[in-house]
Amino acid sequence: QMSYVDHSKSSGPPQPGPMGPMGPRPGEPGASGAMGSRGPSGPPGKNGDDGEPGKPGRPGERGAAGPQGARGHRGFSGLDGAKGDAGPAGPKGESGAPGENGLPGERGRPGPPGPSGARGNDGNTGAAGPPGPTGPAGPPGFPGGAGAKGETGPAGGRGNEGPQGARGEPGNPGPAGPAGPAGSPGTDGAPGAKGSPGAAGLAGAPGFPGARGPAGAQGAVGAPGPKGNNGDPGSSGPKGEPGAKGEPGPAGVQGLPGPSGEEGKRGARGEPGGAGPRGPPGERGAPGARGFPGADGGAGGKGAPGERGAPGALGAQGATGESGSPGAPGAPGSKTGPAGVAGQDGRPGPPGSAGARGQPGVMGFPGPKGPAGESGKPGERGPAGATGPVGAPGKXGDVGAPGPSGVAGPAGEKGEQGPAGPPGFQGLPGPQGTTGETGKPGEQGAPGEGGPPGPAGPRGDRGFPGERGAPGLGGPTGARGAPGPAGNDGAKGEPGAAGAPGGLGAPGMQGMPGERGAAGLPGAKGERGDAGGKGGDGAPGKDGARGXTGALGXPGPPGAQGEKGEGGAVGVAGPTGPRGAPGERGETGPPGPAGFAGPPGADGQPGAKGETGDTGPKGDAGAPGPGGPVGAAGPQGPAGPTGPKGARGGAGPPGATGFPGPAGRVGPPGSAGAAGPPGPVGPVGKDGARGARGETGPAGRPGEAGAAGAPGPSGEKGSPGADGATGSAGLPGPQGLAGQRGLVGLPGQRGERGFSGLPGPSGEPGKQGPSGPVGERGPPGPSGPPGLSGAPGEAGREGSQGHDGAPGRDGSAGPKGDRGESGMAGPPGPPGAPGAPGAVGPSGKSGDRGETGPAGPAGPSGPAGVRGPAGPAGAKGDRGEAGEAGDRGHKGHRGFTGMQGLPGPAGAHGERGPAGASGPAGPRGPAGSNGAPGKDGRNGEMGPAGPPGPPGPAGPPGPPGSGFDFVSQPLQEKAPDPFRGGHYRALRSPDGTQKSPARALLLGGSNDVELRFTYSVSEDGCTTHTGSWGKLPLLDLAPMDVGAPDQEFGVEVGPVCFL
């Protein structure tokens, strides 16, 4: 039924017309309607299936305590508790009864060597040992002193014929000898010079004058005429028979000493003599003259800064001039004038350029020691006074500290044997000590039997002259002999005349530094230096000032597309549009994007256990494993059966040397041995008794010239000659090698302040050095102030369509639907996460035993196993046959001392022994108080000025000093000091405060200025001990002017430690 309502009279908007009649067929389905509102809750559904059991819940909170139960039965005793800590020691119990002696213990290991015992008494002289083998020839000994005059030796054999000597001086006429038998007539000689007429002979019987007949027989010898002049010597006649020995003539008068011979050439340097015994200390020598100034030492390291001095008065500021050119070195100044009153210290000026070192001034004389008190101005030096009389000797000082050990004296005589002490307890044998020093030579053994004659010895030294023989026949003149050995010292000669002035002497040793010279004139401008090396990276600079704003940059490339902007605010709802006509059916839309992966499913049940697989193929042999640890010793195995008797073994190696057996009985005398080699030449026997006087032998021919004799001992020192004229000064010697660094001298007195140098000209600018490396990037600067806002940019282009938005949040869960029918099986899901490991399955059956693999390489040998327990002794084997005799073993070592027996009962007291020898001198007593100072010595004459030393290198400017600074030396400047052990890299320094710093050594000057020198410590190495030695770094201390009764000097060395 339709109804119609007329709304024409309504004044509202037009309403839709009435619905038309139903069309002939149903229309196509319309679009889905909007989701309806939520319906009311349905009735509860059927019970679902039981869920799987949930995880166990957390433990509940602890319940309230229940009421106390009734008392239980007594429990069983508990196990023993752990051992408690040791209690305090109880009181000492009474001594127990002595136990029985225990069994002797095993022999102990040798203990460490004990300290050396005191030296025992010398033993009795042993019996003479058998003669040792001939030793090698020793080195030639030192020349011995002259021996006693020997007996006259027998005449020597005739020497070789010497060359014809020069004609000798005419000899004194000898006594006429007895007439010899007539010789056979010689050939006629050349006619001699006419002799002076002889005495008239007896008149002969007048003969008949006839022709000259042959020479008649020789007539009787006439009386000898007077001596003619000496003819030239004839050739030597045959040797006559020896005449009877004449009586010795009386000793001639000692001749006057001959003139002094020319000085011989310097002999070859002798072998160094053995060290003589230490002589007694000589008397103290006179003080030496002061030496020349030493070369400058190298610059010392920077000293520790001194305490800050009081500020000085402000000096006037000078204008900084340019550096002046160097002045020539000034001439040495004359005597130092009196020092002015010291002004207050000005502030340190800027360091000037180093001037050349001035020549050392002439050395002033040391002033006499003034009384203590404030230092007055030194007065001018007075002239030297005359030498005063020698003062009376001072009191003897107390005994000084013990001197160094002297050389060991000769062994004293053997004292009498003292009474035997009680036996000591047995010590364990010590390990073998080091080889002892060679023992003293024993006393001379009994002489052996005479050996066969030795080979001929070398030619002996020339013997001393025998007693004067009777004059022999005149021999031919020999050649001039070599100079004989030097004679004994002659008597002390008279002082010689004054010598001529000496030549230039060698330059003397460098002396002590002179006083500080006056400041030199400024030095010349130096040459331009080379460009310096590249400097190290500088420290980052401070932040620079803010830079000016830069120019506007070009526009950059367009940026990447920005993310989709957030949605705008919801616009105002528009008016509802008219309902459109139904559209055509749209095409099926594309499938939606895949959803996000769901969470992983729960772990699946573990799968059933698979069957055992087939045995795999045999693997390769593995690499040898490392050696296993040493296994524990296995249990002792049972004794094996006794083996059969072995074959006779070969002779074993010689066994270790056994302990020496007891001495055997004396054997029968052996058969005579073969003659030994000739023994060495025996010592010279004692002088025999003097033989009967022999007959005078014939004069031998002159012997060969003897070797030059050894120089005789030097004669006594002659009295000094008169002083020679002073030689002119020598040229300066070449510069010597740089000496080892000298010790730091005591600081000199402060010199007067020098005048300021003229300002030097400014140097040329140096070359530009290479640019340094780029420095490390500095730290970022502070952020600048915010910039001005920029102009607004142009509007951007329309963005492309954004990506799909993230899925919205899950809606609230709908009500539970009915259980659907089972769906088709889905595709297999992704593999689940691995399940929890299943329980361990039962062990599989043992596989077949694999084939033996190839033997692996031998592993490294494991450490030796623990020594197993000794097996039971085997059955005793049959006795072997006797082996062949081995070589005679070496003499066995001395057996160990047997174990100490129990102490015997005390013997009766012996008689009191004789008094022992006086003990060694006691230690030197403490030093006595210093004696009164001696008078001042005379002033020495002024020495000649030394040659100027080479200018030393300019040192680095030192730190401003207050008083004196004691600057430590750099450890390694030139060659290493051989006496410096490991360098003192680390000395332990005691703690100190800023006000009173710790000092390793405190030295004070004579003006009460402390010289401080503290080592810094980089590491305390006292915990390690390297065994190397070191010395304290105190090189030399020369305390001066200590000796008044209230003065003392000492150095206290605290704990030090060397690495």
From Swiss-Prot:
It is found in: Secreted, Extracellular space, Extracellular matrix. One of its GO terms (molecular function) is extracellular matrix structural constituent. Residues 13-27, 130-142, 945-960 have a biased composition (Pro residues). Residues 85-104, 116-128, 179-251, 283-293, 307-339, 383-444, 479-498, 572-581, 594-621, 656-675, 695-722, 836-845, 861-875, 914-933 have a biased composition (Low complexity). Transmembrane segments: none annotated. Keywords: Collagen, Extracellular matrix, Secreted. Residues 1-997 are annotated as: Disordered. One of its GO terms (cellular component) is collagen trimer. InterPro entries: Collagen, Collagen_superfamily, Fib_collagen_C. SMART domains: COLFI (SM00038). Residues 1026-1059 form the Fibrillar collagen NC1 domain. Residues 47-61, 876-889 have a biased composition (Basic and acidic residues). Residues 143-162, 294-306, 469-478, 499-508, 532-541, 622-631, 646-655 have a biased composition (Gly residues). Belongs to the fibrillar collagen family. This is Collagen, type I, alpha 1b. It comes from Epinephelus caninus. The lineage of its organism: Eukaryota, Metazoa, Chordata, Craniata, Vertebrata.
